[in-house]
């Protein structure tokens, strides 16, 4: 077993060797290096064919028509293109958008930008377990609501939203529904031929494909229109200009093909490992599960350890690559906005750790993790005056701390 152990698969994944090997065939002179938009020679035709194959592989995993897949530079761009693109196109119908407080920053900050441009956004607070109350969502819908953006799986706590029911609610009212599926694709079944979802964002690097490539699903029936945010040569049916990065697209396609074949057995394996991890640490005193095991993705476990500083815990766990909050926000020392939205106090939010498991995680690594976490929590609490006071029965909430 090699240290450190990587348990941050929700931040990114290593490229699968099968994917890397495939990508190498599309880079050099003796490979398929052409521009898929070059229609006048074989180099272009071969590149275009490779892109078509990848588009098919992606659409097959999610039950879409290949013509509904638009390649982007990643899920952040897909979220931007979906939300800004739909808002700009349909603004004559209304200027009201609904999302939730626990969305990824790529959705929240896009909505904030639209607010600056005159749109009105309602941010729904989730229930304590992270699930959106559908009655609240319904109550927030208005005649001028044009777009709802609610994610499938939360990147920090792993809870799964009921996108099927939300889709039905939106379709019945003629509201466009966008789903950020970055964390769910390849981990939960998605069938867009059945779901009433109009726009869906995907990433390559969360499921063993390369970074820098993603896709946006744009429904054809009933047809959804979006305004391009990137202008140029009119690639991707005018929705996203820019020369297609064939090697990255092929890599994403291959990653989606592999995950389609292996998803069922792999998710059962990961669910078993996640449960093993939780069962190994859940009897530690003052430990809290964030999210919902029953309604959660099989690969994410987010836990708070009361009376332990999150940063000191991460340092103590230096043999584990884990995160507190998401990679996109862990650079700041602010407690996780997702956990705060669940109604958690700052102290508990600060002591949270996200374990996210993946394709190369082993049982041996999980057992090592359990042992290390138990020892580290014990050691850090021995050093903590707060823990001592808690054990003596002092109500820490009633203490008035002196501010320096």
Swiss-Prot record:
Cofactors demanded by this protein: pyridoxal 5'-phosphate
InterPro entries xref list: Aminotrans_V_dom, Aminotrans_V_PyrdxlP_BS, Cys_deSase_IscS, Cysteine_dSase, PyrdxlP-dep_Trfase, PyrdxlP-dep_Trfase_major, PyrdxlP-dep_Trfase_small
Catalytic residues, chain numbering: 328 (cysteine persulfide intermediate)
Gene3D superfamilies (alphabetical): Aspartate Aminotransferase, domain 1, Type I PLP-dependent aspartate aminotransferase-like (Major domain)
GO molecular function, one term: metal ion binding
Subcellular location: Cytoplasm
Pathway where this protein functions: Cofactor biosynthesis; iron-sulfur cluster biosynthesis
Binding site residues for [2Fe-2S] cluster: 328
Superkingdom of origin: Bacteria
PROSITE patterns per record: AA_TRANSFER_CLASS_5
Modified residues (N6-(pyridoxal phosphate)lysine): 206
GO terms under cellular component: L-cysteine desulfurase complex
Enzyme nomenclature, EC number: 2.8.1.7
Catalyzed reactions per annotation: (sulfur carrier)-H + L-cysteine = (sulfur carrier)-SH + L-alanine
Binding residues annotated for pyridoxal 5'-phosphate, in chain numbering: 75-76, 155, 183, 203-205, 243
One GO-annotated biological process of the protein: [2Fe-2S] cluster assembly
Alphabetical keyword list: 2Fe-2S, Cytoplasm, Iron, Iron-sulfur, Metal-binding, Pyridoxal phosphate, Transferase
NCBIfam families the UniProt entry points to: IscS, PRK02948.1, PRK14012.1
Family, per entry: Belongs to the class-V pyridoxal-phosphate-dependent aminotransferase family. NifS/IscS subfamily.
HAMAP family recorded: Cys_desulf_IscS (MF_00331)
Subunit structure: Homodimer. Forms a heterotetramer with IscU, interacts with other sulfur acceptors.
Known role: Master enzyme that delivers sulfur to a number of partners involved in Fe-S cluster assembly, tRNA modification or cofactor biosynthesis. Catalyzes the removal of elemental sulfur and selenium atoms from cysteine and selenocysteine to produce alanine. Functions as a sulfur delivery protein for Fe-S cluster synthesis onto IscU, an Fe-S scaffold assembly protein, as well as other S acceptor proteins. Also functions as a selenium delivery protein in the pathway for the biosynthesis of selenophosphate.
The protein's name in its UniProt record: Cysteine desulfurase IscS
Gene that this sequence comes from: iscS
